[in-house]
């Protein structure tokens, strides 16, 4: 993501949670709509979060990190965190079974870090939000179970997808 000057200022400012009015006082030359648009962009990109008290801060303040979801053919996955500005590549995060938050391979996600590490010493996390979906073209076999239809993806990195019988067209299992 190309950051604007305002977004860079906000990231430097939001190391501690702040309300919108506090940000406006700290950046008096910035219009309300301009500030809101920059904040919305940073939130959508997984760099800033808003807490329940309507305070904004960088995601790391809340123990979260954004990255790319990397599914495996088994039930667990990894997230490759975004590289920080200092260039050091952070270790991948382990996502245990059931903690994928509906993410699929290649999605950009926001992960809440856990304090514990897995048995290999990797940090664990839970996907709390899918920020951006990866491409959704999927190749697989159509299967029928009773009255239900599913596509079994060719790659086990993807889950089965339920298909409404009205959307089958001419496809047959």
Regions found by a protein language model. Give the residues of each.
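Charge-lined substrate channels and their catalytic hotspots, especially those that engage the 3′ end
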Residues: 1-173
């Amino acid at each position: 993501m190309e950051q604007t000057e305002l977004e860079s200022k906000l990231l430097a400012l939001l190391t501690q949670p702040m309300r919108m009015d506090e940000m406006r006082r700290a950046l008096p030359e910035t219009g309300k709509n301009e500030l809101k648009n920059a904040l919305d962009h940073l939130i959508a990109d997984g760099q800033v979060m808003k807490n329940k008290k309507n305070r904004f801060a960088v995601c790391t303040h809340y123990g979260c990190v954004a990255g790319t979801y990397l599914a495996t053919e088994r039930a667990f996955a990894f997230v490759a965190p975004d590289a920080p500005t200092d260039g050091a590549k952070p270790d991948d995060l382990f996502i245990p079974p059931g903690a994928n938050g509906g993410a699929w391979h290649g999605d950009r996600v926001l992960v809440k870090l856990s304090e514990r590490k897995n048995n290999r010493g990797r940090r664990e996390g839970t996907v709390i939000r899918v920020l951006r979906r990866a491409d959704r073209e999927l190749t697989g076999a159509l299967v029928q179970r009773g009255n239900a239809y599913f596509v079994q993806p060719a790659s086990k990195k993807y889950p089965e997808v339920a298909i409404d019988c009205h959307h089958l067209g001419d496809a047959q299992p």
